[in-house]
Amino acid sequence: MEGAEPRARPERLAEAETRAADGGRLVEVQLSGGAPWGFTLKGGREHGEPLVITKIEEGSKAAAVDKLLAGDEIVGINDIGLSGFRQEAICLVKGSHKTLKLVVKRRSELGWRPHSWHATKFSDSHPELAASPFTSTSGCPSWSGRHHASSSSHDLSSSWEQTNLQRTLDHFSSLGSVDSLDHPSSRLSVAKSNSSIDHLGSHSKRDSAYGSFSTSSSTPDHTLSKADTSSAENILYTVGLWEAPRQGGRQAQAAGDPQGSEEKLSCFPPRVPGDSGKGPRPEYNAEPKLAAPGRSNFGPVWYVPDKKKAPSSPPPPPPPLRSDSFAATKSHEKAQGPVFSEAAAAQHFTALAQAQPRGDRRPELTDRPWRSAHPGSLGKGSGGPGCPQEAHADGSWPPSKDGASSRLQASLSSSDVRFPQSPHSGRHPPLYSDHSPLCADSLGQEPGAASFQNDSPPQVRGLSSCDQKLGSGWQGPRPCVQGDLQAAQLWAGCWPSDTALGALESLPPPTVGQSPRHHLPQPEGPPDARETGRCYPLDKGAEGCSAGAQEPPRASRAEKASQRLAASITWADGESSRICPQETPLLHSLTQEGKRRPESSPEDSATRPPPFDAHVGKPTRRSDRFATTLRNEIQMHRAKLQKSRSTVALTAAGEAEDGTGRWRAGLGGGTQEGPLAGTYKDHLKEAQARVLRATSFKRRDLDPNPGDLYPESLEHRMGDPDTVPHFWEAGLAQPPSSTSGGPHPPRIGGRRRFTAEQKLKSYSEPEKMNEVGLTRGYSPHQHPRTSEDTVGTFADRWKFFEETSKPVPQRPAQKQALHGIPRDKPERPRTAGRTCEGTEPWSRTTSLGDSLNAHSAAEKAGTSDLPRRLGTFAEYQASWKEQRKPLEARSSGRCHSADDILDVSLDPQERPQHVHGRSRSSPSTDHYKQEASVELRRQAGDPGEPREELPSAVRAEEGQSTPRQADAQCREGSPGSQQHPPSQKAPNPPTFSELSHCRGAPELPREGRGRAGTLPRDYRYSEESTPADLGPRAQSPGSPLHARGQDSWPVSSALLSKRPAPQRPPPPKREPRRYRATDGAPADAPVGVLGRPFPTPSPASLDVYVARLSLSHSPSVFSSAQPQDTPKATVCERGSQHVSGDASRPLPEALLPPKQQHLRLQTATMETSRSPSPQFAPQKLTDKPPLLIQDEDSTRIERVMDNNTTVKMVPIKIVHSESQPEKESRQSLACPAEPPALPHGLEKDQIKTLSTSEQFYSRFCLYTRQGAEPEAPHRAQPAEPQPLGTQVPPEKDRCTSPPGLSYMKAKEKTVEDLKSEELAREIVGKDKSLADILDPSVKIKTTMDLMEGIFPKDEHLLEEAQQRRKLLPKIPSPRSTEERKEEPSVPAAVSLATNSTYYSTSAPKAELLIKMKDLQEQQEHEEDSGSDLDHDLSVKKQELIESISRKLQVLREARESLLEDVQANTVLGAEVEAIVKGVCKPSEFDKFRMFIGDLDKVVNLLLSLSGRLARVENALNNLDDGASPGDRQSLLEKQRVLIQQHEDAKELKENLDRRERIVFDILANYLSEESLADYEHFVKMKSALIIEQRELEDKIHLGEEQLKCLLDSLQPERGK
């Protein structure tokens, strides 16, 4: 096919081919066998680059076809010409199932490095760097090559982005797959966000689902970061950057420092420009290597062309190294990515230009230092010392034609970790990792300067003056220099390049080279620089070098600690003799730096709080050796440091305050250089002293104190944004004594430290980064220290999480009051945060502080470390399992999610039982809530407004609170703040919230909170706001009341978990009316329903739910549920469904204890059941669908269908295979279920619940045929997604295995289910070989199980989306479902449309599992009754085989139907995209498109990781007691790594959810309700369909395995 012209293809394909023909020949490749195809795509029009196949997986289908080569540009897929967008290509590829036809354009030279190349190859392939962009991963020249390869070398913005993406992909896929497990915790943790994504991606590559595209999907779309640096990939990339700055200092990472990064880049690029293409990059890379070494290989991967030529395309954010850095990345990304991308890029280049002159001048001054130190550094870096040397030699980086690369290098140097830029980075990793050698070399040859130069050639410029000043001062460890440079760059980004340069010029040289990495936090460090406001980035870098002592402490807590140790020890001794380069190279280098820093400004260094050890930990992960050495050394001196820190922190606090004023002044007069330079030096000295002594590099995860300390600082900061800078300086330095460091922004122009929440939020809501930093930063950190402000704000939230007693409203209000910021405060915090960019890092720090505060609370609770770790998703899961105090769980989880990711390796059990705060505050949940609100708004303008108000309030609140807390607040806190629209309801809902917080939260933390996190705002709103606001409406609809009644307790749970229920506007009035009309009878049912739903799910689950409800807000819930339950019920139906889904999502079944899982599932089921209509709940209870209800339901359903017919929906066909009895039962049930002819709005609610009609019969089926019948409900469910709530858990369980039915059983554990399980057990008992597969009691974890807590249950998403899209028309009737039941092979287009593919998939899967169970049960029964057990067993097996075969057929049909749904959704997405593109600004459209692309990637990544993790966990569970410890340990390690990665992916999902909300908000301003509903549906269905597809595949696979096992088991018997 090669060389052959493609056959006639669509015009676009022809065009694509024509384009392809330009640079090479077209090759047609035919792949077959289905996904994964085994190749990774990069670039795309989104990235301004060709869509290139960057990697061909060995042994993959793509590899099987020799014609497909890495570097091929995809021109057409399946005869469809590509428009050039990667997402399009991915969709097409994913849409290809059996065969994939690719038309690729092959150039004589490939511009892409195969993904197979590993980071190690980056260094190995240094010579290759110039040859290919991927090669350039380790070498700057390669970037140029990549630039030309992918785009003009000048179009670095896209080129680096794409190339970076490519590199990232390459790095991710290859390095991730190779290194992810190899460097499970340290590297993953450090580069966790990106690295774990990489690893995840790579792992996922292994995973079939994620394999072909998981890498591409997981690959950070840095390239996308052009448009949206907050994209998952960008976040990843940025996280790397953040990580580097975090290592160097989070402040350098401050998103508020968009220019900081740019200026860093600009400062660095000045050096780089001259030789950036050739020398600077290598040299620069050498420098970045230092930072990169931790990521040694990652660095290069993240190395991105400078894009100096493309100011508009700022360098991609560094890959997230860790949750923290991920959060920081988001923040940084926001500033560096978006701002950097646009304004920052220009500024950066301007700054670069400015910096260059200064750099040139400085180079003259630092000329010698650079030359003297740089040569050695370059030599070390071996990163093309020649090139950078020259630049360094001048002290300025001659603008090279590869200025972009140089700039990139500059940014890399600033965030070496994120972009270890030189081929040397490969070497540097060792240098950095060794850090001792690095430092030794640096020290020996004044590597400080050399290192600094090498590490951040661009900074060298900005640091040139500093260099001049620093002279030998640059001798500081190169890593430190990097950190400082990074910090400087970040600061430069924050500060005008002039300022940065000026500050750098004024910066004391010694510090600059000394603690660059550590300087990232430097904001406090260089008060003068801050005052100067211009070179603070350089201050951060140069000053970081000069005042490096400060910076290093910030940049790398370990280094800072080391520096402090050195400062304390060495400074105290006046020598680093105690710290020997041989014994403690890192500490020695740090000490060297510290000495220099003290020279520069011990005070400042003290002022600069060292970044948390997490920073060090991250660098550590990048360079385990360095981290280990440093950590060991630091730990050795930790006690001393802590002592010093406590002492110095107090001192530094005061000093920091002084510095703060200066910083403020600096901020105000950011251009001051000379005086500020001196003052800055003084401050640096003071800050350095404080930082080194007061702040320790201790990792938060290692030492909870830092959190406490930081919270103190945060308190101060929170107290006074202006003082925040001091607080940042003093606070970090002063963390021990929060009093001294008044509220100092972590750094005014610098990177603020955000909590994981804040970081996540910053990622998802870059525009709120400042807000995140300030509002939440203040609150979170203050809470621990200044309980007044902190408690009021973040502390309150924490307390809320801990006590869950504070009403959510209080929290938002308190936060506002404490902050003294109105709800608008989020805006103000943003302003303040941006004004005090330091605050933003502080926000991170605050978040960290929050985490730490949470830890402190946890510590108080006796689980300080654990709460922090809850931050990780695994921890969240663990926390769900543990069900720790809601406060700690959620706050700590949210705050610590990023940090905890590092701690993922820690036993989740180690972590306190936390409510899945993330899930609770799941961005998607919030988003969905918001969307639901929007939907409701659309549906009912009146309710919609409150809903809108709530979401806005939520967003505002979120802006104030840390991202997760914000989410939690949105769910929990926003009820109060967002209850304002539904203030009327708010009283009751707040009561619910309060009750939930006070009572239910503790119990509901898992479920309720999880639900809250996952529940759509609609639910929350309906739960809380609906009661009062919708009180009339809600109350008027009897059915809604029922639904609420049914849902009320679930809603209560949901409300408990989702105090923000009010966020979701009450169901549209029309909905309540419909409910009134249709649910008049159900209105009475609410009470009964409440009673019934509880019994229905299961006594235990009901009890739990009721208890939670009663605890949380049973009175309110019941009272409001019954009187207000109608709308509430409607909303609650959604809420319940969402709650159940959310509960499932927040509390992955696998994560929760079986009982809890069952309860949750039951609750979900019950909620779902309740949602439909109380009547049905009783029916369920009775297990007999009321005929009258059936009639009503049919009418209602019909109405709903009719109403929904108006809904625009993508046809979703779900093939349900069920027995005729099931069909009949379900039909009859469906009739009762149908009665929920809710008001149109309510229909949507019901649709969301989808249980309204279907769940009813689903319930009925489930209850009537609980054992096997659940399948029928699922089948019925096609018409109603809500049954999926019930189904989904069963599906998941089924996915898990027929025991999946256990899941349903857990929900509805009926006698039949128990019988089925018993029979299955009997069969298993007879044939142990089938135990794993057939034993109902065997819980097989599936991808869906692990995905459960991540995504709001797809059913809910689909329901909401479908509701929005009004898919109910396809639900037209359970009859349709019944017909489908009758014709399982026929896609249940109508009902399935309602259910969406997800439901269809769920139904087939459920049917398959149910049938299997039925057969098993039958077989088991036969066995019981049969005298010949063996014969009976064989017969039963045969029956089971037949049933499974039928189910498999149904599942396959469902898969085909799902494909149709996917295609339909893709079409819808294309339509939506076209609309969005037409109405939205390009930047907004880019955000939309990147979000969509990231959504696909994140979902696939999560699926892949979930699948892999499920397999590992299953393997662990299946390990025999006699299994070798080595095997178990290996699996445990894999599990740990996968859990970390999974948690990282979850954070990505949270970020994605926040981005989704952002995009939704953007689109809401442009799109009509219908279009917006289509968008919501598309987005939700996109992920739901992907998940559903994966679930179907898993179920099919399970069924096939079951069949195989059964057949195999029968053969021996036959042989007998």
From Swiss-Prot:
Q: Can you supply one Gene Ontology CC term for this chain's record?
A: bicellular tight junction
Lineage, top-rank taxon, reads Eukaryota
Q: Which residues form the ASD2 domain?
A: 1317-1611
What are the GO BP annotations of this UniProt entry?
Answer: actin filament organization; apical protein localization; brain development; camera-type eye development; camera-type eye morphogenesis; cell migration; cellular pigment accumulation; ear development
GO terms of molecular function: actin binding; actin filament binding; beta-catenin binding; ligand-gated sodium channel activity
For bias type Polar residues, the affected ranges are 186-197, 220-229, 842-854, 975-994, 1159-1176
Q: Does the keyword Transmembrane helix apply?
A: no
Query: What keywords is this UniProt entry annotated with?
Result: Actin-binding, Cell junction, Cell membrane, Cytoplasm, Cytoskeleton, Developmental protein, Membrane, Microtubule, Phosphoprotein, Tight junction
Q: What is the effect of changing residue 1245 to H?
A: In a breast cancer sample; somatic mutation
Positions modified as Phosphoserine? 231, 313, 325, 413, 851, 897, 921-922, 924, 974, 1036, 1039, 1171, 1173, 1297
Report quaternary structure and partners.
Answer: Interacts with F-actin.
The text the record gives for the protein's domains is:
The ASD1 domain mediates F-actin binding.
> What protein is this chain from?
Protein Shroom2
